[in-house]
Regions:
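A detector of repeated loop/turn-to-beta-strand junctions in beta-rich toroidal repeat architectures
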Residues: 102-107, 170-175, 240-245, 310-315, ...
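Bacterial signal peptide processing site
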Residues: 17-20
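Blade-edge motifs of beta-propeller repeat domains
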Residues: 34-68, 107-140, 178-208, 245-278, ...
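C-terminal motif of bacterial Sec signal peptides marking the signal peptidase cleavage site
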Residues: 12-15
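Hydrophobic beta-strand segments that make up the repeating blades of beta-propeller
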Residues: 88-92, 158-162, 226-230, 296-300, ...
Length: 531
């Protein structure tokens, strides 16, 4: 099949292989706009300005059918070899290990950035610059990946979660691993041979520690800390089934070896508010109150806060991490801001991100609600993305039913699921973060490709509007999935891969089928350079 049918649409564009222009509507006056396109238009004869195989910047093909390269939490970037270029870190949680003898053990790959990446990186034909192998069959290593300097040497480290890893005969406790970055990073690291620098193992069977994973400096010491989620942990005293928990393990120059959460209490444990919340579905971190330390942004899309009218409305939490070790219970007490979804089954918090999108020097919270129903609730499951601007005066609670946050971005069509993934990055090189939003089940290219998927980029800046309906345009760039069922936007990240001072888009198509459609559901990841 052709590589992903991404699209860069300018104010006047021409169909790929054709010469009839498409005229864009008037851009939204509230959002700075580089280029727009009619988001709901008759199906074109050809997808405007297709990014065909010849025009792709870089595509990474999963090695084998069914690997699920670029799963939902399996994509990020970081400078892992310290050369000044961002590198791609992508997981394949259903890959089968070094000799294909660990079914679904999982793998994670690092592809080094540089001034010119090859247009095609086929993991079946060439090894990644670094490959991590899961320890045992069914571990699902690479279901989550993250980056951060957790040992304080100035170079980003590779982090990968294995949500189904066992610990001492306890099944599916989950684990997270780190391989420390540096100029000599490369080759292979097999968890079965102890070739990782750090292991954090869960404690109770079925907790799924490593389901979510990030790194951030939450205590302000200049070293990133490891934050991992156990989405099915059962809360204080194991009395809240599947409430979920988050553990903070402080980074340091001495961090390494093996940490067992059952024997070595972490710095902080955050407990989900109610049974079934499965905190965190995803998490991010940023300095959301401007105090110089990063707060946690935790998503709980199945939360209802005990209100039957809010069934699965979802919630997101901004958690301030104390210097004092201990626990924080989201069912009571302070130390956090809660954001509650507007309507039942909105799924607020399905994906979250942080970044300074209005340029005031304080990070902002970006929260996806993949099942929200759009403008006036008239587009079922179109999806929404909500923006809460950071501030030293964050309130203790916010309910979207009482009014929107500082900005809301609405999906175009019913069942698009905008906000399934979100990310931020400085795509324009102006020092302000822009917003990226994935809609992996959108019918791309004028609704001609069922579930082809789409990715939108929205310009950040001081004129970021209160509401943006993507059906009216107002976005910078629109990327289209190549074929029906590819689900472009299933994963999403940014990083300055080519070192030009602008972040580039990294997007995954979980169900793409590899070269010539010969590897069903191998998965693909794409690097789309900012221009």
């Amino acid at each position: 099949m052709p590589l992903a049918c991404f699209v860069l649409i300018t104010l006047t564009t021409f169909g790929c292989g054709g010469d009839s222009p498409l005229t864009s509507p008037t851009p939204s006056p509230t959002i700075p706009t580089i280029s727009t396109v009619p988001a709901q238009s008759p199906t074109p004869a050809v997808c405007p300005e297709d990014l065909t195989e010849e025009r792709a910047d870089t595509v990474i093909f999963g090695a084998q059918a069914g690997d699920f390269l670029a799963d939902r939490f399996s994509l990020t970037s970081g400078d892992f070899n310290g050369d000044g270029f961002a590198d791609v870190l992508v997981g394949a949680p259903l890959a089968d290990g070094p000799a294909n003898d660990r079914t679904d053990g999982g793998e994670a790959y690092v592809v080094f950035g540089g001034p010119s990446l090859p247009p095609v990186i086929d993991l079946a034909e060439r090894a990644a610059d670094l490959t991590l192998f899961g320890q045992e069959a069914d571990d699902n290593l690479g279901f989550t990946v993250a980056s951060g300097d957790v040992n304080g040497d100035g170079v980003d480290d590779v982090l990968a979660g294995a949500r189904f890893a066992a610990n001492g005969g306890r099944a599916s406790v989950g684990a997270a691993y780190a391989v420390y970055g540096g100029p000599d990073l490369g080759g292979a690291s097999d968890i079965a041979d102890g070739q990782q620098d750090l292991t954090i193992a869960g404690d109770d069977a079925g907790d799924y520690w490593g389901f979510a994973l990030t790194a951030a400096d939450v205590n302000g010491d200049g070293i990133d800390d490891v934050i991992l989620g156990g989405s099915s942990a059962d809360g204080p005293g194991d009395e809240r089934h599947d409430a979920g928990s988050v553990a903070v393990v402080l980074g340091s120059g001495e961090l390494g070896g093996r940490i067992d959460l059952g024997l070595d209490p972490p710095h902080l444990v955050v407990h989900g508010a109610r049974a079934g919340d499965t905190l965190p579905n995803f998490m991010a971190a940023g300095d959301l109150d401007g105090d110089g330390r990063e707060e946690l942004l935790l998503g709980a899309p199945f939360a209802d806060r005990g209100d039957p009218t809010k069934e699965r409305a979802g919630a997101a939490y901004i958690v301030h991490v104390s210097d004092t070790a201990g626990s924080l219970d989201l069912a009571s007490g302070g130390g956090f801001t809660s954001i509650v979804g507007a309507d039942r089954r909105d799924g607020l918090g399905f994906f979250v991100a942080t970044g300074d999108v209005n340029g005031d020097g304080i990070d902002d919270a970006i929260v996806g609600a993949r099942d929200a129903d759009g403008v006036d609730n008239e587009r079922g499951n179109a999806g929404e993305v909500h923006v809460l601007l950071g501030s030293p005066d964050l309130p203790p609670s916010l309910d979207l039913a009482a009014g929107s946050l500082d900005a809301t971005i609405h999906g175009v069509d019913t069942t698009d699921s905008l906000g399934f993934t979100v990310a931020t990055g400085d795509l324009k090189g102006d020092g302000v973060q822009d917003i990226l939003a994935g809609a992996p089940v959108a019918d791309s290219c004028g609704n001609s490709r069922s579930d082809g998927g789409e990715v939108y980029t929205i310009a950040g800046g001081t004129s970021l509007g209160v509401a943006l309906d993507l059906a009216d345009g107002g976005f910078m760039r629109l990327l289209y999935g190549a074929e029906a069922g590819d689900e472009l936007g299933f994963s999403l990240a940014t990083g300055d891969i080519d070192g030009d001072g602008r972040d580039d888009i990294i997007a995954g198509s979980l169900l793409a089928d590899g070269p010539d459609n010969a590897r069903e559901d191998a998965g693909q990841a794409y690097v789309v350079l900012s221009r």
